[in-house]
Amino acid sequence: MRALAIACVAAALLERATVATAGQSAPGPDEFAARLAALALLQSLNAELLSHDSATATLERWCANHRLAEPAQIVAERLREEKPASAEVRAALEVRPDDPLGYRRVRLKCGDHVLSEADHWYVPGRLRPEMNLTLETSDTPFGKAIAELHFRRRTLSARLLWSPLPDGWEMSATPPETEAGALAIPPYVLEHRAVLSLPGGEPISEVVETYTGEVLAFPSPVAR
């Protein structure tokens, strides 16, 4: 209910404000209504991510609900990079220092919008062979590739990388000062770290997801 209320507030505010994403300019001015709308939307997305097991499915719904692309489909753009797992990651996955781990870094896109970048460390021995093959040879999002395992997600941390309004703004008698020009949104706005586990509790992957300013790059409502 809280997420729904926040989304309704954001929709109403967006009738009055347009925001620019990732430092790009837009017609909307940097004003209190635009910043409040951006904050409400980020909190709404954060709540959705925290309350569902699949970030891919959550982003796909976000893409559809906010008309980011047609069709509203999330695709993974795989980046051929390597990043060794830290001792902390191995501890979270309950594996020994010499146990093999898979690694995958992807950008999740909806149409032309890159909505997030994700680092996945996973335990190949706890996945089905066909799932490992899919992860190694295709751009299928991780959550879709292992969906048949009915995995569960446990969030380790979630933090805003950008706050449109300063701390304590709600206690002020006057709105915070804003800058001249369009409201600029930085490249990265939200970060989640989570462990994905089998229904029995055995961990299969740790993921660090960094969400971009493009999550707010949807068209403003048309006044009627």
Which residue ranges define each predicted feature?
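Bacterial N-terminal signal peptides
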Residues: 7-16
